[in-house]
Curated annotation (Swiss-Prot):
Name of the protein in question: Putative ribosome-binding factor A, mitochondrial
GO biological process, one term: rRNA processing
Keyword Thylakoid in record: no
Biased composition (Polar residues): 225-234
Classification of source organism: Eukaryota, Metazoa, Chordata, Craniata, Vertebrata
Length: 343
C-alpha cells in the first residue's frame, strides 16, 4: 500500500516538472506562471454588500417621501448671490421688475388665481428679481394683525406656483423664475409707528395749544423770572450785534405798521444831503491828518470851514525890474519868489 502511494507521488512530481518545462518553453524568461487572487475585488464586494440607501431627488410610492432630500424652506431662493452684475444687467432688471410688478398686481386684483386670495386684497410694494434670475421676490404690505399676516402669507405661498403658471401662459416672460412672497419690513415699521402715534398721550388739548403758541412768541416779550440771558459777548469786530439786531427788529415792526417807509425815506434824504455837502467841501487843501478816525470825529470838517475865508497863496515868476529892486531882499534858490494876493 505504501509502495503504491509512493509511486503515485513520484508520478505527480514528474507531471509538475513537465508542466514547468512547458511553461518555460511558452514564456521564455518567465520562470513562474500567472497568478490570480480575489483580493482586488474586495472593495466592489464591500460596496454591493453595504445597506446604505441611495439619495433620490423625487418622491416614489415604493421609496416613500422620507428618503427624499428636503432642503430648508426657500433657502435656495432667499440666499444672496455674490455675482457681480454689469450696468446693462441693472437696466434689464429694472425693466423686468416693473413688468412683473404690473402683471402680479393685475392677477391679485382679479379672482383668476383664487377667490380667497382676491378677498384678502393683498397690495404689493415692489417686485425684485435676483441678479442670477433664480427667484422673483414679491414684497407685500402687511397689516397690524399678526394672525392676519400669517394667514395672508400662507395663502400667497400656496398660490405662488399657480401665479407663475398664469404668467408663463400669458407670455409675460419666456421663463418666469419661482415667485417668493416676502413681507415688506419697511411698510411694517411704518404701520407700527402709526399705531404707536395713534395711542400716544400728548396731554390735554389746552396744554398743546399753549405749547405751540410759546414756540412762536414775540422775541421782545419779557422772559420769565427763572430764565437768564446769555452772558456771552455779542460784540464782534467792533460791532454790537445785539444793538444791530434790535434796530433791524424795530425797522421791521415799523414797516409792518406802515411807518417804516416814511422813516426810510427820511434817512435816505439825509444821507443824500450829507453826500452833496461833502462833494462841495472837497477842495485842495494843505497836508493834514486825513485818517478815517479824524474824518469821522469831525476834525477835518472844522479845518475846511477855517480855510474858506483864509487867503490863497499862489506862486508866480516875477519880472526883471522887480528882481533888481529886491536884490537886497531874500531870494529863493531857484530865482522865484512867492507873493500873496488877497482876493
Amino acid at each position: 500500500m505504501w509502495a503504491a502511494a509512493g509511486g503515485l507521488w513520484r508520478s505527480r512530481a514528474g507531471l509538475r516538472a513537465l508542466f514547468r518545462s512547458r511553461d518555460a518553453a511558452l514564456f521564455p524568461g518567465c520562470e513562474r506562471g500567472l497568478h490570480c487572487s480575489a483580493v482586488s475585488c474586495k472593495n466592489w464586494l464591500k460596496k454591493f454588500a453595504s445597506k446604505t440607501k441611495k439619495k433620490v431627488w423625487y418622491e416614489s410610492p415604493s421609496l416613500g417621501s422620507h428618503s427624499t432630500y428636503k432642503p430648508s424652506k426657500l433657502e435656495f431662493l432667499m440666499r444672496s448671490t455674490s455675482k457681480k452684475t454689469r450696468k446693462e444687467d441693472h437696466a434689464r432688471l429694472r425693466a423686468l421688475n416693473g413688468l412683473l410688478y404690473k402683471a402680479l398686481t393685475d392677477l391679485l386684483c382679479t379672482p383668476e388665481v383664487s377667490q380667497e386670495l382676491y378677498d384678502l386684497n393683498v397690495e404689493l410694494s415692489k417686485v425684485s428679481l435676483t441678479p442670477d434670475f433664480s427667484a422673483c421676490r414679491a414684497y407685500w404690505k402687511t397689516t397690524l394683525s399678526a394672525e392676519q399676516n400669517a394667514h395672508m402669507e400662507a395663502v400667497l405661498q400656496r398660490s405662488a406656483a399657480h401665479m407663475r403658471h398664469l404668467l408663463m401662459s400669458q407670455q409675460t416672460l419666456r421663463n418666469v423664475p419661482p415667485i417668493v412672497f416676502v413681507q415688506d419690513k419697511g411698510n411694517a415699521a411704518l404701520a407700527e409707528l402709526d399705531q404707536l402715534l395713534a395711542v400716544a398721550d400728548f396731554g390735554p388739548r389746552d396744554e398743546r395749544d399753549n405749547f405751540v403758541q410759546n414756540d412762536f412768541r414775540d422775541p421782545d416779550a419779557p422772559q420769565p423770572c427763572g430764565t437768564t440771558e446769555p452772558t456771552t459777548s455779542s460784540s464782534l469786530c467792533g460791532i454790537d450785534h445785539e444793538a444791530l439786531n434790535k434796530q433791524i427788529m424795530e425797522y421791521k415792526r415799523r414797516k409792518d405798521k406802515g411807518l417804516g417807509g416814511l422813516v426810510w425815506q427820511g434817512q435816505v434824504a439825509e444821507l443824500t444831503t450829507q453826500m452833496k455837502k461833502g462833494r462841495k467841501r472837497a477842495k485842495p487843501r494843505l497836508e493834514q491828518d486825513s485818517s478815517l478816525k479824524s474824518y469821522l470825529s469831525g476834525e477835518e470838517v472844522e479845518d475846511d470851514l477855517d480855510l474858506v475865508g483864509a487867503p490863497e497863496y499862489e506862486c508866480y515868476a516875477p519880472d526883471t525890474e522887480e528882481l533888481e529892486a529886491e536884490r537886497g531882499g531874500g531870494r529863493t534858490e531857484d530865482g522865484h519868489s512867492c507873493g500873496a494876493s488877497r482876493e
